[in-house]
């Protein structure tokens, strides 16, 4: 645990859960982590390898978001996920995708079978800095 980023992620996680699951700890190894306004946790893959790893760590009740028209990250959202948190996570998926800023995109959120679709304009990454862990 010599990586200061990993240590900070563990501290942040333990402020929000009483007991960390194996999945919680495994997810700390991958992606960019955001604590969303409603308290849900979002993990944004940085590479294809991280996207693949994140996809294997989905639990019941989690959402997996992805931009439909452009390459980009998978965004895993877990915890008590509000509608607002899902909208913010859709913005994360768009901002970190290859879609040019200001481009209209569609983001699909998959919670184990029933999809939710968000249509938005690609925001800047700076919009999400307040929630970066």
Short names for language-model regions:
Residues 26, 33, 60, 68-73, ...:
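RNA-binding accessory domains that recognize and position tRNA/RNA substrates
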